[in-house]
Amino acid sequence: MAEAVFDASAILALLNNEQGAERALLFLGGACISAVNAAEVAGRLEASGLTSDESRDAFMALGVEVMHFDSSLDWIAAGFYQPTRALGLSLGDRACLALATKLNVPAVTTDKDWAKFGFSQIVLIR
């Protein structure tokens, strides 16, 4: 069972050895990510110059389970739209929060604006 849900920003911090990577490592065992956020990671890695195969290999090496974004999650994410609109949270952000809500585990991110939302289980890694 998943123990934490990673946002794309936390995965990218790990892969790029950015500030917060050491803290993110504490949550890596038992971590999962929404397929929406996994697509964000792949896009960012490919934008940085990696091939599709290289980005997939780098991501898969972390051992993070990719979770489907299904109809149970879309309604949870939709419910976060209005309360987070002023904070500028993206669909990816809301997908991560929806999965964390469904699994009742912390969401791991670098995005400080999430703390303003009042979601009780947010881990800011930097």
Roles of regions detected by a PLM:
Residues 11-12, 38, 114-115:
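A generic structural signal for short hydrophobic patches within well-formed alpha-helices
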Residues 66-70, 123-126:
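Short acidic-hydrophobic, aromatic-tinged amphipathic segments that line or gate anion-handling sites
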Residues 3, 97, 101-126:
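Acidic, PIN/NYN-like endoribonuclease modules and their adjacent C-terminal/linker elements
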Residues 67-108:
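Active-site neighborhoods of divalent-metal-dependent phosphate/nucleic-acid chemistry enzymes
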Residues 30-33, 62-67, 106:
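Short loop->beta-strand "edge-of-pocket" segments that line small-molecule binding or catalytic clefts
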Residues 1-33, 45-57, 126:
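Short, well-structured N-terminal submotif of metal-dependent ribonuclease cores
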